[in-house]
Amino acid sequence: NNGKFLLRIEDTDRKRSSFDAINIILEGLEWLGINYNDIPIYQNSNINRHKEIANKLLNEGKAYKCWASEEELLRMKKIAQKNNSNIGYNGLWRDKEPTNNELGKPYTIRFKAKKNGETIVNDKVQGDVLFQNNSIEDFIILRSDGSPTYMLSAVVDDHDMMVTDIIRGDDHLNNTAKQIQIYNALDWKIPKFSHIPLIHGDDGSKLSKRHGALGIDYYEKNGFLPEAIKNYLLRLGWSHGDKEIFSETEMIELFNLKNIRKSSSRLDIEKLKNLNNHYIKS
């Protein structure tokens, strides 16, 4: 469809975005032969743009400053857990004016989430997923150190990069409901979303290293071929009849979102090894 594949490194969380971690991503893509257009875009380089949008929302009354202390936040969280509620922040500063005690102290900026009605995620894989707005708390878009959160940065960058289609794990569905509210608050066009099931271990539990969930560099160093890895990942949760072996051209031509299953797939290392043997022999 003549689309572009842009690589964005989401490095706003500086503690988790080391040079080595980023390099593993870049080298892994190169080894797999997954080529992106243009140069990588580092999210942190757009931090001033993210702050600009946070302040725009603040000035328009769609966000607010929050001076809640760690003790207050912990107390709210405990109350929420006791009441079995998803709302960990009770909107303490939503309509509260600061006093001299707060002025000059660090604060976060929270998005003023809608409290009435519902937010619907029109998803290409999951169908329409409905969220009651009273279950979405006022979430932080700018931390007390002035750094933007993923929730805001991803929306701003997707808009500025003219991203039309977002395909990601279904663990992001809750985030998407929040991000749709940001899109609407800014009167920006909402991209098409597709939330695909996560890969689980062979026992059905959350994937971990004991299941073989290791970095792509592990498989490269242990004799796996990139063709086998791509073929195996393609067939996890997606099918085209009974066909098991796909050339790269076939992968591109045949893949579609409508054949993705809603249920989670299980990582089967033995099947991956067998597929790898096929590619070694061919």
Question: Where are the regions that the model predicts?
Answer:
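N-terminal Rossmann-like or analogous alpha/beta NTP/dinucleotide-binding catalytic cores
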Residues: N1-K82, N174-W188, A228
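Active-site cores that bind ATP or allylic diphosphates and position pyrophosphate for catalysis
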Residues: L7, E60, Y64-K209, G215, ...
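Catalytic cores of large soluble enzymes that bind and process phosphate-bearing ligands
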Residues: S17, Y42-N46, K65, K112-A113, ...
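Short, compositionally biased low-complexity segments
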Residues: E27-E30, S153, S263-I269
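Residues that form generic nucleotide/phosphate-binding pockets
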Residues: I53, M76-I79, L92, K96, ...
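Catalytic adenosine-cofactor/nucleotide-binding cores of aminoacyl-tRNA synthetases and other
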Residues: N174, L186-S282
